[in-house]
């Protein structure tokens, strides 16, 4: 599982459209929020905290927030639009359409019967200069506690 000291996998991720490839910053501090699936109730309750607290995160040195879901880019774009302020927000909604990032980050689980075979565990990771420096992993993927925006923000 993703852990402190982990480096980011070198895989292709997308935002907004298939031609828009996402590259995580190699320098500075940012947050990756791993979610099992766009539009699911727990995920849709977790993400607004990151959008609402974007300025507070920036004040603590966070240069970006990247919500990564094992969904296609059209789904993640629509999900971003579904949030009040989502379109104006600087929070990135990133598609890991084939789960390659999730697998390489060792953050996947089998969600067969509900969401499909591979989904991401729910976590938040603070990354600094390409390495994970803090990680917040939920014990159950339906929980939104340990990886909530408030908990991550208070740890910075």
From Swiss-Prot:
The active site is at residue 43. CDD domains: PRX5_like (cd03013). SUPFAM superfamilies: Thioredoxin-like. One of its GO terms (cellular component) is mitochondrion. GO terms for biological process: cell redox homeostasis; cellular response to oxidative stress; hydrogen peroxide catabolic process; protein refolding. Its main location: cytoplasm. Residues 2-156 form the Thioredoxin domain. It is found in: Cytoplasm; Nucleus. GO terms for molecular function: peroxidase activity; unfolded protein binding. PANTHER family: PEROXIREDOXIN, PEROXISOMAL MEMBRANE ASSOCIATED PROTEIN 20. Belongs to the peroxiredoxin family. Prx5 subfamily. May act as a chaperone rather than a peroxidase. Has no thioredoxin-dependent peroxidase activity. Shows weak chaperone activity. This is Peroxisomal membrane associated protein 20. It comes from Schizosaccharomyces pombe (strain 972 / ATCC 24843). The lineage of its organism: Eukaryota, Fungi, Dikarya, Ascomycota, Taphrinomycotina.
């Amino acid at each position: 599982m993703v852990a402190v000291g982990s480096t980011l996998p070198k895989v292709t991720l997308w935002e907004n459209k298939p031609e828009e490839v996402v590259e995580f910053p190699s320098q500075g501090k940012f947050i990756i929020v791993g979610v099992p699936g766009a539009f699911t109730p727990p995920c849709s309750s977790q993400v607004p905290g990151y959008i609402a607290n974007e300025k507070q995160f920036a004040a603590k040195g966070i240069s970006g927030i990247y919500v990564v879901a094992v969904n296609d880019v059209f789904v993640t774009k629509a999900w971003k639009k579904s949030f009040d302020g989502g379109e104006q927000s600087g929070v990135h909604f990133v598609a890991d359409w084939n789960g390659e990032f999730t697998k390489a980050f060792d953050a996947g689980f089998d969600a067969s019967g509900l969401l499909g075979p591979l989904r991401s565990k729910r976590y938040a990771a603070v990354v600094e200069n390409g390495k994970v420096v803090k990680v917040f992993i939920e014990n159950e993927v339906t929980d939104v506690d340990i990886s909530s925006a408030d908990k991550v923000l208070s740890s910075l």
